[in-house]
Amino acid sequence: LSLRLTEQAKKVVHIPHLLYYWRSSPTSVASNISAKMYCLEAAMKALRAHYKRVGVPVDDVTMIPNTPGFYKTDYTITKPGKVSILIPSCDHGADLRTCVDSIYRKTTYADFEVLIIENNSKEDGTFRLYEQLQKEHPDNLRVLYWKGTGFNYSALNNFGAKEATGEYLLLLNNDTEVITPRWLEEMVMYAQQERVGCVGVKLLYPDNTIQHAGIGFGYLTLAAHMHKNFPVGHPGYMGRLVYAQDVYAVTAACLMVRKSVYDEVNGLDESFAVAFNDVDFCVRVREAGYTNVFTPFAQLYHYESK
């Protein structure tokens, strides 16, 4: 019923008052979802019917393991395209090697290119690494040389975006490592949707606690990573660590966006050289009429200190 109502509704609002109390009994799902297991299958059937009615192609709808009542939709990738992975780099060759190796070793999405954006490195070993990586991946890895000075994350990515040949841009920190092989598929299935702007992923610290699972506003500080430091297996508040959802913003440590959207909002604001460039970008994307999405089904390590 709710799905059919939202198919017709122009706007859905929340009324912050208790309007109804539900009686809980041993035979009710209000006390235990296992009381009526057939409801879980019925819910997936209802979701599949909903997608069919609204004309959204999906490959499957499945229940998320160990979280009955939460479901994963695998949207059909109807707009496949090249993903341009932009990686700003300044020395720290070991981090870059780990990042790039994980991309090529694990990624199952075939159509991508890697653009390493060189930013005033000093170590000879860094440039030897660039040469080696280009020899290993001559068909789809390039090193771009930014002519600016100092560090400006926004300017680096804007420079890389101009050189990118893909329909999708993926901003990626060099201190990350891919965990899930289908990470690009999981991101593209949302980034392809006209309503979607930015797509972010679940990032983990090396100790398998949450580094990023979406950014919220007004919690402890102006903008903060939600569920930061939660253990990786924790479902989060109302299950928010286990299902894809709209969020206000996502980190640019791993952020996918259609190149057309990136260009529409004029890329990252270069006045935000180090911090808040991603938050500002996501806000402008929302103001342009898009929503931002967090998916926990694409996971990477982010070797950032706590």
Predicted regions mapped to residue ranges:
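Short, acidic, metal-binding catalytic loop of nucleotide-sugar glycosyltransferases
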Residues: 101-111
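A short, conserved alpha-helix in the catalytic core of glycosyltransferases
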Residues: 1-17, 47, 183-187, 241-266, ...
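Short aromatic/hydrophobic "clamp" motif used to bind/position activated sugar donors
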Residues: 169
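Conserved donor nucleotide-binding strand/loop of the catalytic core
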Residues: 130-155, 163
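A recurrent flexible, glycine/aromatic-enriched loop bordering the glycosyltransferase active site
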Residues: 152-155, 162, 218-260, 264
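A conserved acidic beta->alpha catalytic loop
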Residues: 118-129, 148, 177
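Cell-envelope/extracellular polymer assembly enzymes that use nucleotide-activated donors
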Residues: 81-86, 113, 280
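Conserved donor NDP-sugar-binding/catalytic core segment of glycosyltransferases
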Residues: 9, 25, 176-221
